[in-house]
Amino acid sequence: MSITQKVRNWVEEFDVIVARSAFGRWFRLEGCGHPRERKGSRFSLEISAGLTTFFAMAYILAVNATILVDTGGTCECTEANRDDCDKLDDYVLCKEDFHRDLVTATAAISALASFCMGLFANMPVGMAPGMGLNAYFAYQVVGYNGTGRVSYREALLAVFVEGFIFTGLTVIGLRQWLARVIPASLKFATGAGIGLYLTIIGLSPSAGLGVIGHSSSDIVALGGCPPEYLNADYSCNGHQLQSGRMWVGIFCGGVLTAILMMYKFKGAVLAGIALVTITSWPRRSLVTMFPHTLTGDYNFDFFKKVVSFRKINRILVAQQWNVTGGQFAIALITFLYVDIMDMTGTLYSMANYAGLVDPRTQDFEGSAVAYIVDALSISIGSLFGCSPVTAFIESGSGISAGGRTGILGMVVGICFFISLFFAPIFSSIPVWATGSTLVLVGSMMMKSTTLINWSYLGDSIPAFITIALMPFTYSIAYGLIAGIICYALLNSIIYAIDKMSRGRLVPADYNQKEAWTWRVEGGLLPQWVRRLFKGNRRFWEDPDDRKAMDNATLEMATSRSYSEDGKNEKTTHEDVTMKETSLKKMDDERISVDEAVGESESFSNRQQDFRTPYAGIDMDTDDRI
């Protein structure tokens, strides 16, 4: 037997041991004995899938800091024209310090949120400050160098409050209900619109490749000029497409990454970013990010430390707690709406991809816990100075690699924790290294357009409006609002005409319309809330979890340890009978308690009712907390 085969056999044996342990039953690994064990899930496969997800989303450490630093953060500037602040050496150095804080903060909150999402919600997703949400935070709410309607400190407070509001909405089940009641085509259009939004950011000169620039006559124009020919308003004074940084980012960060992705290379995104970054580190290079200037020297001195744990100096608990005026309320409401749509769409898509969605209720396992973890992560992230935290669409790479449980999320969290000690490296990643990444991520998010119902204009037009207005208004919120208003207007008018004409005047393709109703199956309140109201003292326990524990106890009672010759020793008939009698008594007591609180539906009936077509998993809506 070869060494490879021996290692493979050892891994398989270890997977079986882990699956049969309490750890395996908690995460519902295949072979654990849980009624809703997740088919195909193995411990070793979850570890590999977690690493794949981290490599796919590790770019957020650089990209999130690059986007949020444009707000200016807590740096002070008294210039009337905030664009002139970038000409002040003290302000520029302050922003560089702010950028380093953001790298540490992003790693910290990503580690905490991903680990908790995996441990408590058992969801195979990675968490981090969301792309699109951070752009909205930076460019729509706070503005470049603080030119927006709300200051950076006030925006952090809005995010902090938003998280607690989300927690309340989750407890009463309203957040899950909103996720299920949104028309399907608008859900898919939201992801595509955010993809186009990210694409524009990736092509821009401030946070990307610089392929496009400003034009006073045409709004946007061709860019790509060297830094010495780039005007303050990001328009080019000639020499378009002659920037070495842009071409390095396109070929090394874009073309190479795309080819690696076509070959299903794990970590393709990270490889492209790493290549462009390493190319930009030599100081004598034409594309260096450490030119011999005041800022370049300052950055290079920090970069030379390589390994260093950096404390968060400027943005830790930076909220402005005494706020007045309507602009804060507008920012809070907008964050609520935008984040609930973004998180809902992403988390639902990942749960569906992993086969965890119940096709009848359109809810997924652990939805209540997942939304609560997300909500608390949003508030904690604001204390670290970050924009709202959300589930990452790149989690799909880990799911496609076989990830099905929360072990994937825990691995992602551990990897982000390790990255905390390499802040000088991660804070020295240039924007042209991540610009192509944003474009590629945007292209992947456009895949959701294939799921839009293009057969009926009442569904397709609102979806298209949503997609188009997000990048063209440079606002996710405006696109979502326009899409929902358009959907309600068109379909309400058609519905009224249909009723008034008694069904004689209907569109030719009306039978192609997606079914929609506000009455979602499964009700509004989560199952654990219902058990609480019915007087169940152990309302937090899922009945299937109790049954799994009973089965595990029975299995341990009917087996003994292996003897030296490798054969199992059988237990006596009296021991087995006594154990089975005890377990039957425990089960009868549990059933009587369930009947007392009005839960008469048996497990077998629920198992027959909930069949998911995605991964062959018998499951029910799970709202464990």
Curated annotation (Swiss-Prot):
GO terms for biological process, alphabetical: adenine import across plasma membrane; adenine transport; guanine import across plasma membrane; guanine transport
Keyword Transmembrane helix belongs to the record: yes
Membrane topology term: Multi-pass membrane protein
One GO cellular component term: plasma membrane
Chain spans, region Disordered: 595-625
Keyword Cell wall biogenesis/degradation: no
Signal peptide range: none
Protein keywords: Golgi apparatus, Membrane, Transmembrane, Transmembrane helix, Transport
A GO term, aspect molecular function: purine nucleobase transmembrane transporter activity
Localization annotation: Golgi apparatus membrane
Membrane-spanning ranges: 49-69, 107-127, 154-174, 192-212, 246-263, 328-348, 369-389, 406-426, 429-449, 465-485
Pfam families to which the protein is assigned, alphabetical: Xan_ur_permease (PF00860)
The organism's place on the tree of life at top rank: Eukaryota
InterPro entries, A to Z: Azg-like, NCS2
PANTHER family per the UniProt record, alphabetical: XANTHINE/URACIL PERMEASE C887.17-RELATED (PTHR43337), XANTHINE_URACIL PERMEASE C887.17-RELATED (PTHR43337:SF1)
The family this protein is said to belong to: Belongs to the nucleobase:cation symporter-2 (NCS2) (TC 2.A.40) family. Azg-like subfamily.
Name of this protein: Putative xanthine/uracil permease C887.17
Natural source organism: Schizosaccharomyces pombe (strain 972 / ATCC 24843) (Fission yeast)
